[in-house]
Amino acid sequence: MSERGTTTAPAGLDAGADARHPALRVADRLRLTTVYVLLLTATACWLAGQSHGARARFVRHNSSNVHHMEVGKWWTMFTSGLVVDGVPAWAGIAAVAVVLGLAEWRWGPARAGAVFVFGHLGATLLTEGAMWVMLTARIPGALSRARDVGISYGLVGTAGCLLALGPAPLRRFGLPALGLGLAVTWALDQQLADAGHLVALGLGALAARTPWLRGRARARARVPVSATR
């Protein structure tokens, strides 16, 4: 049988398409996560080179607290998410790479980014709104200039959504276990951020009930393993 008229790809063309380092292929697929991790790393490296006073000023000026909301500095709700606080920078950045990366791998950048931002902004607005009510009612312990920066609200919200859309064992045991751990931490420390983590977890579980995410999760589950490689 003649093979004239058929087109054969040059040997090595397909191999060349996949010749990149595996890390580069992953970064290309997880562009949102890669960009965010690079931003967090750049901010952490810059802060590491500053004095203690300069770092404290940066955190203070980028905290999304009641005072900044009242004076119109709403942009702090976004810039606060560029600072890793409360844990070593490498640990926070690694957690973002894993959790946001897994979400982007499963749902795509639009859905993963939307869930992360929903958890971050939603928990920030609700906790600061509660703080504003406490200040208005003159309840002791309320602070208008509270230190509130970090990636944790978006991180917890995304993790909660992943657990809620995961296999049955994760939904039944993983999500309640995370909620219990966060509740115990809040009961022991009584910090604003601890309450925000519980709120973010609830928001993540709520986001998992939307058709936009549930439909994507079902479609992903129906795709054969060979088709996702």
Where are these regions (language model features)?
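Aromatic-anchored segments of alpha-helical transmembrane domains
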Residues: L40-W46, H120-G129, A177-L192
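Membrane-interface micro-motifs in multi-pass membrane enzymes
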Residues: G141-L162, G196
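Hydrophobic, membrane-inserted alpha-helices
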Residues: T76, A94-G101, L155-C161, P176-W186
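N-terminal signal-anchor transmembrane alpha helix
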Residues: A17-R60
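Short, Lys/Arg-rich, polar N-terminal cytosolic tail immediately upstream
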Residues: M1-V26
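Loop-to-transmembrane alpha-helix initiation sites
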Residues: D189-G204
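Hydrophobic alpha-helical transmembrane segments of integral membrane proteins
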Residues: R111-I139, L201, A205
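N-terminal TM1-TM2 helical hairpin plus the immediately adjacent luminal interfacial "cap"
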Residues: L47-P109
